[in-house]
C-alpha cells in the first residue's frame, strides 16, 4: 500500500450541483437518505444527505443557475482522511499538485472541515477531507 492509500479511511461524499436544492433534497429523501447537515455560504446553499456509508453533498449557486453548465453533473469526489497534513505531504511526494496553495477550511458539520483538492487526468477534482 502506498503512502496516500494508507491515509484514506473511506469515501467522504459525492458533490452534485443542482438548480433546485429543495427538490434535490426531497428526491434523495424519497430514496431513504436523511438530511444530515445544511450550510449557507455567501455563494451557495449546501446540504449533506446520508444513507448508511453514502454521503451526497448537493449545492445550489445563489447567483448563477446551473453554474456548472449542465444538469446532473458530478462535480467532484472526496475521500475521508485521518491526517490532512500527512496526506498533503504524501500527495506532494507522489508528484501530484494541489489545486490551492494551502489546506482550506469550510464551516461544515459541527466543527468544520479541512481539505485540499487535486485534479484527476480528466480535470475532475478529487478532494481529501478531514472532518474536525
Regions found by a protein language model. Name each.
Residues 29-30, 90-94:
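Short amphipathic alpha-helices in soluble, non-transmembrane regions
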Residues 1-5, 92-132:
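Vicinal oxygen chelate
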Residues 20-21, 82-85:
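Helix N-cap motif at beta-to-alpha junctions
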Residues 1-22, 74-77, 129-132:
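N-terminal beta-strand motif that seeds the catalytic metal site of vicinal oxygen chelate
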Residues 67-80:
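Helix-adjacent hinge/juxtasegments
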Residues 10, 43-45, 73, 109-112:
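Exposed loop/turn and edge beta-strand positions of beta-sandwich/beta-sheet ligand-binding modules
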Residues 16-56, 109:
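Core segments of cupin and vicinal oxygen chelate
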Amino acid at each position: 500500500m502506498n503512502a496516500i492509500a494508507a491515509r484514506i479511511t473511506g469515501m467522504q461524499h459525492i458533490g452534485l450541483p443542482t438548480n433546485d436544492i429543495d427538490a434535490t433534497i426531497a428526491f434523495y429523501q424519497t430514496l431513504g437518505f436523511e438530511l444530515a447537515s445544511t450550510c449557507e455560504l455567501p455563494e451557495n446553499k449546501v446540504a449533506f444527505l446520508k444513507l448508511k456509508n453514502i454521503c451526497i453533498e448537493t449545492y445550489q449557486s445563489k447567483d448563477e443557475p446551473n453554474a456548472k453548465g449542465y444538469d446532473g453533473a458530478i462535480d467532484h469526489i472526496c475521500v475521508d482522511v485521518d491526517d490532512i497534513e500527512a496526506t498533503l505531504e504524501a500527495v506532494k511526494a507522489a508528484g501530484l499538485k494541489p489545486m490551492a496553495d494551502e489546506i482550506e477550511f469550510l464551516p461544515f458539520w459541527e466543527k468544520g472541515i479541512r481539505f485540499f483538492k487535486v485534479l484527476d487526468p480528466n480535470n475532475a477534482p478529487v478532494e481529501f477531507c478531514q472532518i474536525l
